Amino acid sequence: MDFHLTKEQLLVRKMYREFAENEVKPLAAEIDEEERFPMETVEKMAKLGMMGIYFPKEYGGAGGDVLSYAMCVEELAKVCGTTAVIVSAHTSLCAAPIFENGTEEQKKKYLPDLCSGRKIGAFGLTEPGAGTDAQGQQTTAVLDESGENYILNGSKCFITNGNVADTFVIIAVTGKTTDKRGRSMKEISAFIVEKTDKGFSQGKHEKKMGIRGSSTCDLIFEDCVIPKDRMLGKKGEGFKIAMKTLDGGRIGIASQALGLGEGAVEEAIKYTKERVQFGRRISQFQNTQFQLADMHTRMQAAQYLVYAAAMKKQNHEPYSMDAAMAKLFAAEAASDVTRRAVQLFGGYGYTREYPVERMMRDAKITEIYEGTSEVQRMVISSHLGVK
């Protein structure tokens, strides 16, 4: 696989890096401390096309590619995990499933506003009793007597962008069906929900360990009325759509983890070259050099996995296992590398005077959302034929 970036990719990467350094980094500590969603940053990203990078221009997108999107999330995460996941969830979990599964009318209606950043997107799959077990959905969607609307009842939890989003892709149970072995199972479908829909509400902001500026909340459906033409895909295709959406989402989260780890390495190199102990810069100690060598190597390996998955998705090749491998490795590498960075900083690393403690807190969630590390191992082993 050719990992050489094109001239255009190098240019947009430079733009993302400069934007992250000049516009995102100065606010990162503040939005973490205040648990504040950085709407002003989202508006600036929208003007640069960063909210719809790999969608066609005919739908309002930037007309870029999936690798450019991954690099955008990566560069943002180097300085702010919160801002990175805002773009990832909006793009991979809302705009992407509409683009990949929607009717032409749905794409023309929703994508221009999402790609321009006029509206923010979110995805509702996780429920209080259905996290890793996506088949455990309890939210229902029942066709009303007129046959024109679905009535949704239930709730979703831990929804990224939840309190600020305008457009949601929601997974709900629409009946019962049977599997290939004749066993009864839930029929699951996908819907597009708008913030203004009757019977829909958003819950309180969750107080989190990391990505504290990210809006995370419950979504509540109480006889929520959804026109039937807002079903995404066909009836009963919701589980397939959800799994396909998560495959793409894992590239986004792997990119977030990659950026967090790389950012921690950069901070650690800079600090160890300045910090003096026992009359020497601590970068001169062999232990420090070996630590940094291991940290950089892990993140370089993670980058290859992430870029490979992104390129396979762009080329319309099967990429489910690649996305799972990228997320598994990048997430666990980021958690390890950010922890090591804090250790290299010593007591200062444990304070908020430096960003590495925030990076460590932000990195942990990448091992959990959009499929835990254990789920990624299940996905990978399944593709290997180990069942």
Positions of the model-derived regions?
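Short Ser/Thr-interspersed hydrophobic loop/turn segments at strand-loop and sheet-helix junctions
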Residues: 49, 73-77, 172-173, 193-198, ...
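Flexible, glycine-rich active-site loops centered on histidine and acidic residues
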Residues: 95-101, 123, 135
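Short Gly/Pro-enriched turn/cap motifs at secondary-structure boundaries
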Residues: 129-132, 158-161, 181-183, 208-215
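A short, Trp-centered hydrophobic/proline-enriched beta-strand micro-motif
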Residues: 117-125, 171
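Alpha-helical interface subdomain recognition
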Residues: 1-89, 101-106, 115-118, 131-134, ...
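Flexible, small-/acidic-enriched active-site or ligand-binding loops
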Residues: 136-138, 198-225
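A short core secondary-structure module
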Residues: 148-202
